[in-house]
Amino acid sequence: MEHVPGSFGTSASFALRFGQTIFSAASLIFMCFDFDFYDFTTFCYLAMVMAIVTPWSILLALTDTYSVLVKLLPQELRVLSIVFAGDFVLSFLSLGGACAVASATELLASADGKICDGSLCIQYQVSAALAFLCWFLLLASALFNFWSLPSLYY
């Protein structure tokens, strides 16, 4: 089997997973700095998605680490299909959450500052920006794994 750079079990995949873990955890931390995010559904949605993406990325980063160090992880069609499907679904969930939080924060900030003070809106904007970065890395992982799927059929 030919390894595509960035596909599951490579060092480039580990780098993508490490970035996903950092960005999703940071987005979750910035979202949870304030307890008022429970008042808005979009903020709860992003916190929930990032709470799912973080362990997913950690688990796959550990698997990539094992694969790179031991060089013993076999590439199976079923495993790679599950990883691709998980990355693909989570990438669009995180894109939806990031877009929703970015638009809700902009709406709250434009309401004359009555609802969202300066530092709180900045925290939400940083959380949305980190979620966008996490989405980009998740989509890149999904595309690299999708690219390597056909080589497992032969």
UniProtKB/Swiss-Prot annotation:
The keyword Cell inner membrane does not apply. It is found in: Cell membrane. It is a multi-pass membrane protein. Residues 39-41, 103-128 are extracellular. The chain crosses the membrane at residues 18-38, 42-62, 82-102, 129-149. PANTHER family: CASP-LIKE PROTEIN 5B3 (PTHR32021), CASP-LIKE PROTEIN 5C2 (PTHR32021:SF21). Homodimer and heterodimers. This is CASP-like protein 5C2.
